[in-house]
Amino acid sequence: MKATMLLAVVVAVFVAGTEAHPHVCTSYYCSKFCGTAGCTRYGCRNLHRGKLCFCLHCSRVKFPFGATQDAKSMNELEYTPIMKSMENLDNGMDML
């Protein structure tokens, strides 16, 4: 019983720290997750030094010729200085 209550508290804390936003992503870093497809729904994870933005749903880009392009994978993204700093932050959080 106590273990179940503890698990419920841990899940509640995690969910409370994540906010989902149904509007178009305005963050440059968050939009990079989707590449050219764009982000239609994103979330922000609260961290001790700010928020980490991540995309929950990438839209598809429709071209006038009828072709569609799926969202880019993380391996195809540009390795920008912002992404380097976020990776360093992620590695630092893993050490804790």
From Swiss-Prot:
Record keywords: Phosphoprotein included? no
Protein's name according to its UniProt entry: Myticin-B
Which GO BP terms sit in this record? defense response to bacterium; defense response to fungus; killing of cells of another organism
Keywords for this protein: Antibiotic, Antimicrobial, Disulfide bond, Fungicide, Secreted, Signal
Function statement: Bacteriolytic activity against Gram-positive bacteria M.luteus, B.megaterium and A.viridans and Gram-negative bacteria E.coli D31. Possesses antifungal activity against F.oxysporum.
**GO CC list:** extracellular region
What is known about its processing and modification?
A: Contains four disulfide bonds.
Q: Where in the cell is it found?
A: Secreted
Give the pro-peptide residues. 61-96
Q: Does the keyword Signal apply?
A: yes
The source organism is: Mytilus galloprovincialis
> Could you say which residues form the signal peptide?
1-20
What does the tissue specificity note say? Hemocytes.
Q: Which Pfam families match?
A: Myticin-prepro (PF10690)
